[in-house]
Amino acid sequence: MNDFSKEAVKPADSATAAAKAEKRSRYAAGVMKYREMGYWQPDYTPKDTDVIALFRITPQPGVEPEEAAAAVAGESSTATWTVVWTDRLTACDMYRAKAFRVEPVPNPAEGEPQYFAFIAYELDLFEEGSVANLTASIIGNVFGFKPLKALRLEDMRIPVAYLKTFQGPPTGIVVERERLDKYGRPLLGATVKPKLGLSGKNYGRVVYEGLKGGLDFLKDDENINSQPFMHWRDRYLFAMEAVHRAQAETGEVKGHYLNVTAGTMEDMYERAEFAKELGSCIVMIDLVIGWTAITSMGRWARKNDMILHLHRAGHGTYTRQRNHGISFRVIAKWLRMAGVDHAHAGTAVGKLDGDPLSVQGYYNVLRESHNSVDLTRGIFFDQHWAGLRKVMPVASGGIHAGQMHQLLDLFGDDAILQFGGGTIGHPSGIQAGATANRVALETMVKARNEGRDIANEGSDLLEAAARHCTPLKQALDTWGDVTFNYTPTDSPDFAVTPSVA
């Protein structure tokens, strides 16, 4: 029965009618500009539950920056190249990504206009606990889009509601230090060199010498898996024999990162289980195994009380170029979500590319409970980590004892300093190389704790210590003047810093 007592419905005002007409026009058949389809919304206010991505866009000539930003939003969410009627079967206004802010990049290095585009994504667009699904949207298809000359994902804000669906690191910095009973200093490591070609027995000898000399860890390199010259099982047996012997002789907890990277997940699980049976406290994986495999190994490590080390093998193919690819600060966030305990994050002073402030930003993303906006270190968003455990950053690649003061000053205590060639290339042998690094580290930690200015006094402090430590003196004589002083290819847009090398 009709209720005529209710107030009659008033005709829509002109603004409402215009809005409805504009909305209907988005579904006219044919090709429309992305910003006309609703992917450019400058008045949009992001919600606390939105995933926000910051892209550096370089439009093709003639493409307006707002249209380029809208295209990125569209192609990384719900759009295709033409209007489709099935949009009307979805809550497309909610699911549509929204480019809400575009601003020019200050002083673009390439000399052509670049823009920062801020894009918000509804949380329902992503599967819970899946970095693979997150990346399939954010970087899955849009990087090959023709209207863009180049595209780079610079940073992301991950909402707490989404972070809570991830396990995060299986062990974390606090629990790892408890297991190792090592506090108040960075951990020391080294990569076995040469990375390929050693027999299992000689490999184990390198591990023993390094640990006996004072290192906390030795490690496999990224490409040592199971090759004809050394089957993985042989390497594990000899390496763990060395670990147990060094532990018994030094009274310290030691470890070796046994690389379980393999061609299938079944093989990786088999290797990890064998490492655990041998008494290892840690296993290692490579970034190239992919996000689903990383997450799976993180869950295995959590269930089995193992530390999980990640080598960022392959990252330079997409992180190094300033105008195209993905910043490593984003990779660092994804790694923390997927669940690793260690992650290589740069040295600033070694042989691998990395601006000092940018590298500090990567470290902060991995090991802080909350990241505040810090444009000088490339951090664009406040990021609350919702209780996810902290990842221990790893400095590795072309570093030596003569740089110990720089490394400690840059990165502090919660880091792992890995000296591969700087240990195994020592003129008096591996054990002497390890001792040189341990003495250099303890010298710097003691001086810092006494209030000394290690950044400026470090070289003199090392020289003084070397008068009482022949291995350190030999290390300084061999590598003291070795630097890799090149201009970084990627540095923060809001602060230009020289190399510290």
UniProtKB/Swiss-Prot annotation:
N6-carboxylysine carried by residues: 219
In which organism is this protein found? Paraburkholderia phymatum (strain DSM 17167 / CIP 108236 / LMG 21445 / STM815)
Question: Residues at site: Transition state stabilizer?
Answer: 351
Superkingdom of origin: Bacteria
Supply the InterPro entries for this chain: RuBisCO, RuBisCo_large_chain_AS, RuBisCO_lsu_C, RuBisCO_lsu_C_sf, RuBisCO_lsu_fd_N, RuBisCO_lsu_N_sf, RuBisCO_lsuI
Q: What is the lineage of its organism?
A: Bacteria, Pseudomonadati, Pseudomonadota, Betaproteobacteria, Burkholderiales
Pfam families, alphabetically? RuBisCO_large, RuBisCO_large_N
The entry's function note states:
RuBisCO catalyzes two reactions: the carboxylation of D-ribulose 1,5-bisphosphate, the primary event in carbon dioxide fixation, as well as the oxidative fragmentation of the pentose substrate. Both reactions occur simultaneously and in competition at the same active site.
Which positions does UniProt annotate for substrate binding?
A: 141, 191, 195, 312, 344, 396
Does this entry carry the keyword Endoplasmic reticulum? no
Enumerate the cofactors the protein uses.
Answer: Mg(2+)
What's a Gene Ontology MF term here? ribulose-bisphosphate carboxylase activity
Provide the assembly information. Heterohexadecamer of 8 large chains and 8 small chains.
Q: Which GO terms describe its biological process?
A: reductive pentose-phosphate cycle
Stated name of the protein: Ribulose bisphosphate carboxylase large chain
* Further remarks about this protein from its record: The basic functional RuBisCO is composed of a large chain homodimer in a 'head-to-tail' conformation. In form I RuBisCO this homodimer is arranged in a barrel-like tetramer with the small subunits forming a tetrameric 'cap' on each end of the 'barrel'.
Active-site residues annotated for this sequence: 193, 311
For this protein, the Enzyme Commission number is: 4.1.1.39
What are the alphabetically sorted keywords of the record? Answer: Calvin cycle, Carbon dioxide fixation, Lyase, Magnesium, Metal-binding, Monooxygenase, Oxidoreductase, Plasmid
Binding-site residues, Mg(2+): 219, 221-222
Record family assignment: Belongs to the RuBisCO large chain family. Type I subfamily.
- Name the chemical reaction catalysed here: 2 (2R)-3-phosphoglycerate + 2 H(+) = D-ribulose 1,5-bisphosphate + CO2 + H2O; D-ribulose 1,5-bisphosphate + O2 = 2-phosphoglycolate + (2R)-3-phosphoglycerate + 2 H(+)
According to the record, cofactor stoichiometry and binding are noted as:
Binds 1 Mg(2+) ion per subunit.
User: Enzyme class, one word?
Assistant: lyase
